[in-house]
From Swiss-Prot:
Keywords: Host cytoplasm, Host-virus interaction, Inhibition of host innate immune response by virus, Inhibition of host interferon signaling pathway by virus, Interferon antiviral system evasion, Viral immunoevasion. The keyword Transferase does not apply. The gene is Segment-7. Signal peptide: none annotated. It comes from the Viruses. Its main location: host cell. It comes from Infectious salmon anemia virus (isolate Atlantic salmon/Norway/810/9/99) (ISAV). This is Non-structural protein 1.
Length: 256
């Protein structure tokens, strides 16, 4: 893998992040109205290592997205967008082992989150909540010391930390294309560490356009899927987003 760049656009913040993924690590730069100066791209983590993953190889692709350490604050223009961005956005062969290592000072944790932590896999709610709490206990200022999962077009984890201090461990499942639309459906589940409870499920629409992908988030109250089976595509009503959309101002816009 020779490496590639993608941009994360947030127009209302007046800027964007350019994320570079290479064989030796990742590089992040932020700039607003002005183009970045020489040397403005900094290593997100000197210890970060991504497995070699052939890009554009084969007919079947998996979409892997990791957003770690999204911290929202109002300190500066840069921090008002996000003060750190670590992630990967890759198309690769159907099964990919994707792991993070040494993302913080604590490196002794070895934590693996299941790819599909649905209720039926647990004997009771306490056991399910215990699983989430155990997984989140490994989190640090950055997210998880080590997080490993298998991406097969199924669930993959995304970490978000809001300015209110709540940790959200979001599992997203690709649920198939939406007939008659350029978008596809994902299911999401939130866990709010601050409130110590499992959050609501939501259904989201991911719009694909000429520039790339736009993630559009729905209110948690809007849920029409049975989890791992991916039946959301049968129930999705596109106007839900206009009526009940809770988005990060049209979400995160990715452009390869």
């Amino acid at each position: 893998m020779s490496g590639f760049n993608f941009e994360v656009m947030v127009p209302e913040q007046g800027g964007k992040v350019v994320f570079s993924l290479t064989e030796t690590g990742s590089c992040v730069s932020f700039y607003g109205d002005d183009e970045p100066g020489e040397g403005s791209c900094e290593l997100a983590s000197e210890n970060m290592d991504f497995p070699s993953c052939p890009l554009g190889n084969g007919d079947d692709f998996c979409l892997s997205l990791a957003l770690s350490t999204m911290r929202w604050s109002g300190m500066t223009k840069r921090n008002n967008f996000m003060d750190r961005f670590i992630g990967s956005f890759v198309h690769c062969t159907p099964v990919m082992i994707w792991s993070y290592g040494n993302l913080s000072k604590k490196s002794h944790h070895k934590m693996v989150c299941h790819t599909c932590p649905d209720e039926y896999k647990f004997s009771d709610k306490d056991e399910m909540q215990g699983y989430y709490e155990e997984c989140l206990e490994a989190s640090t200022d950055i997210f998880l010391d080590e997080l490993a999962t298998v991406v097969t077009g199924g669930f993959f984890p995304v970490g978000l930390k809001g300015s209110w201090g709540g940790w959200y461990l979001k599992y997203v499942r690709y649920a198939g294309p939406l007939a008659g639309s350029s978008g596809f459906i994902v299911n999401q589940r939130f866990y709010d560490r601050a409130q110590n409870k499992t959050g609501s499920r939501v259904v989201s629409m991911v719009e694909m356009d000429g520039d790339g992908l736009s993630f559009i988030y729905e209110k948690p109250s809007v849920y029409h899927s049975d989890g791992c089976t991916g039946s959301a595509a049968r129930f999705w009503k596109r106007d839900h987003n206009e009526r009940a959309g809770v988005e990060l101002r049209a979400g995160l816009h990715f452009r390869m």
